[in-house]
């Protein structure tokens, strides 16, 4: 290669570089700058999305803890209400049993009194009949009362000694 060829190649290369620089360099540079901006924007968006996701995870975790605490409170309240209801039912049953015992005792006492009164009347009638047959006469009311009271007293003494 001669100096002329080298010079020609150099000039041609420079002209070609200027032409490419004028025609293609600006669009290629713009395209590279746009691509750099897009990549930078995508990285910023990805970082923001990651931070948002982390914040959302933290928020959900906090809500979950609050939900668990609320669930524990609800369960404890339900247990407490159940225990109160159970105690109320037990108290009501105990009160009913006590009332039934009192009523039964009252009925027993009344039946005993009625039986004693009936026995007293039967004994009085029997005593009066026996006394009339033995004495052969009718007793007046005071005599009857005295005989009956005396007989009941002796019955009470006899029952008390057994």
Curated annotation (Swiss-Prot):
GO terms for cellular component: plasma membrane; proton-transporting ATP synthase complex. Keywords: ATP synthesis, Cell membrane, CF(0), Hydrogen ion transport, Ion transport, Membrane, Transmembrane, Transmembrane helix, Transport. The chain crosses the membrane at residues 6-25. It comes from the Bacteria. It is a single-pass membrane protein. Pfam families: ATP-synt_B (PF00430). Belongs to the ATPase B chain family. F-type ATPases have 2 components, F(1) - the catalytic core - and F(0) - the membrane proton channel. F(1) has five subunits: alpha(3), beta(3), gamma(1), delta(1), epsilon(1). F(0) has three main subunits: a(1), b(2) and c(10-14). The alpha and beta chains form an alternating ring which encloses part of the gamma chain. F(1) is attached to F(0) by a central stalk formed by the gamma and epsilon chains, while a peripheral stalk is formed by the delta and b chains. This is ATP synthase subunit b. The gene is atpF.
């Amino acid at each position: 290669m001669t100096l002329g060829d080298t010079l020609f190649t150099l000039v041609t290369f420079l002209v070609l570089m200027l032409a490419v620089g004028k025609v293609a360099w600006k669009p290629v540079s713009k395209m590279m700058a746009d691509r750099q901006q897009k990549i930078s924007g995508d990285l910023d968006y990805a970082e923001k999305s990651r931070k948002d996701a982390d914040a959302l995870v933290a928020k959900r975790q906090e809500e979950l803890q609050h939900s668990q605490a609320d669930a524990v409170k609800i369960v404890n309240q339900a247990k407490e209400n159940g225990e109160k209801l159970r105690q109320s039912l037990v108290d009501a049953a105990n009160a009913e049993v006590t009332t039934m015992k009192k009523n039964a005792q009252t009925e027993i006492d009344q039946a005993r009194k009625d039986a004693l009164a009936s026995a007293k009347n039967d004994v009085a009638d029997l005593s009066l009949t026996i006394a009339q047959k033995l004495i052969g006469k009718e007793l007046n009311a005071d005599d009857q009362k005295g005989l009956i009271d005396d007989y009941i007293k002796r019955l009470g003494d006899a029952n008390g000694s057994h």
